């Protein structure tokens, strides 16, 4: 006989400070939110990415509200995207430097412009996706909708968007030189800096930093190729290369969003652990107490780290935060 105590009946209430943090959610349902375009990017070129993206998020949230996993079946993918195939698998093979990571390689722009010169941009799908990317970076907002999603939900199409960003910049440089790259970067960096402020997820902010780093390295390469800069170049670059401001590097919104995901999915805890869903596990787990512990040990510490200056972080970054 095995006795398993039902610890779940002694679960805690949600901490008041958590309730307060979650009481003012950001509304992603605003005009000009690029997040919907991200979710619609995988659709066939004939479909409107914005319309598809809204339908995808609505489908995911509707399933979560009914207690189902917020994921898409093959049939749902076919109906929403117009296909179940990955339509963006071929052009990255033609231009492999589109996947070049600026964190690991400082020569991404050089490699990509060489590949574009050897094989000019002509793929119909790629040209359609570049047009979609142009639309994305014209949007005034990028706010991920994390409401009523779970840990199995698909992310926005961050990877393909990064690849398109690099191709977009390389094409501008190859066609119009430094002037073209500066003009392209003005629009690109404006969008990504806005995303750095509004992004509701940590992965979104990491992707944004990657995109900005790629833009900076591209500009650095192009500037280095110029024998001298004109006064107009210098003026535009000074405007473009302003340091990030405190509100642009604040990660509180992303941490709160991570906390919200934990709170909304705490009753499905056993669905996400390797042991699987079982009655003994249901007895042993205190879902809300686990969320409270996660908040005190991780989220609250993240808030404290976010308030440190660069020098303080490097000096104290390995010190436990109480």
Q: What label would you give each PLM region?
A:
Residues 1-322:
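Short acidic linear motifs
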């Amino acid at each position: 006989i095995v006795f398993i105590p039902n610890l779940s009946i002694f679960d805690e209430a949600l901490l008041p400070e958590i309730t307060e943090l979650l009481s003012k959610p950001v509304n992603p349902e605003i005009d000009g939110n690029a997040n919907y375009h991200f979710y619609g990017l995988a659709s066939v070129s004939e479909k409107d990415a914005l319309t598809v993206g809204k339908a995808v998020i609505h489908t995911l949230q509707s399933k979560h509200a009914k207690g189902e996993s917020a994921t898409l079946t093959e049939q749902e993918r076919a109906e929403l995207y117009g296909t179940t195939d990955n339509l963006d698998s071929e052009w990255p093979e033609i231009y492999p430097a589109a996947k070049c990571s600026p964190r690991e390689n400082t020569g991404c722009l050089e490699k990509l412009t060489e590949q574009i010169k050897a094989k000019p941009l002509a793929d119909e799908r790629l040209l359609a996706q570049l047009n979609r990317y142009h639309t994305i970076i014209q949007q005034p907002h990028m706010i991920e909708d994390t409401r009523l999603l779970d840990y199995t939900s698909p992310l926005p199409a961050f990877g393909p968007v990064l690849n398109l960003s690099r191709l977009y910049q390389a094409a501008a440089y190859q066609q119009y030189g430094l002037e073209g790259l500066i003009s392209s970067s003005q629009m690109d960096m404006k969008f990504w800096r806005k995303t750095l402020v509004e992004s509701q997820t940590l992965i979104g902010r990491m992707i944004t930093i990657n995109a900005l780093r790629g833009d900076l390295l591209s500009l650095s390469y192009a500037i280095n190729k110029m024998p001298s800069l004109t006064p107009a170049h210098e003026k535009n670059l000074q405007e473009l290369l302003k340091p990030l401001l405190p509100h642009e590097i604040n990660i509180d919104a992303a941490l709160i969003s991570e906390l919200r995901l934990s709170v909304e999915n705490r009753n499905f805890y056993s669905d996400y652990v390797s042991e699987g869903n079982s009655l003994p596990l249901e007895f042993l787990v205190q879902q809300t107490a686990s969320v409270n512990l996660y908040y005190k040990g991780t989220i609250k510490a993240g808030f404290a780290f976010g308030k440190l200056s660069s020098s303080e972080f490097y000096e104290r970054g390995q010190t436990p935060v109480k």
